[in-house]
Amino acid sequence: MTLPEFFGNRYHDEKKILLGISSAIIVVFFLVYTASALASGGKLFNTVFGIDYHVALFIGAAVILIYTFMGGFLAVCTTDFVQGTMMLIALLIVPIIAWGYVSGDFSSLLAQSGVNSEHYMSLMYNGDHAITPIEIISNLAWGLGYCGMPHILIRFMAIKNEKELRKSSVIAIVWVVISLTLAVVIGVVGRAYLLPMILGETAGAPSTESVFIQMIQETFTNKINLPFIGGLFICGILAAIMSTADSQLLVCSSSVSADIYQIGRASCRERV
């Protein structure tokens, strides 16, 4: 059962209006969402291996499409577990090592970040200006909306019983808090760690999208000569991209093949 189908059954949508609207929303917006994940994969290969962006984009999309369509929901869930583990290890270890090279305490870390603003770590400021109510609402919608995303909810719909459902809810929230907190830590530590590259404005100077990649390369190439370990952590970034893209692709394809097809078939029967 897909999420639009659940809503249709729950609210007795005999005319399939709710089914059609929810399916259309998923297909349109998840195609864009999936495209952004695939674009991130292309940028990763382009930054690490120097492969042409469009070629890298095609390779990443092909790999994800193959195992998603061949294995379906089971393949996506299995690979997501492995990919999530790799991502968590990378998020934990890389900033800790980088922090060790920058400083030993948080205050000196901020001092070495090269930011003069007193509101750098304030939740109520965006740069030097206070955030507006619209920005607060937008940020809350972005964060809280994660819990209602279709590619997340289908995991809960597949759980065996109510007891496991409650346990899974706790695990999911803890995972979100840990991963998003570590993502913020990477940004703060990465700015201080890569400050010489940023100030030098060299060809390899990191953009905001490649800070984590540059942290891994700088640590395991220039600081610690363990390129194999660095490669594994870069795989953690790839795992994050793939685990998002395959889940969204599965939800999108399910909406097309099950929900939209069901509406079209019913329309054809009425005409006949």
What are these regions (language model features)?
Residues E5, Q248-D259:
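Re-entrant/interfacial helical elements at transmembrane boundaries that shape
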Residues N9, K43, T47, G100, ...:
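Transmembrane helix-loop junction
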Residues S23-V27, A61-L65, Q83-M87, L91-V94, ...:
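Residue-level recognition of pore/gate-forming positions within transmembrane alpha-helices
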Residues R10-G20, S254-R271:
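Loop-to-transmembrane helix boundary motifs in multi-pass membrane proteins
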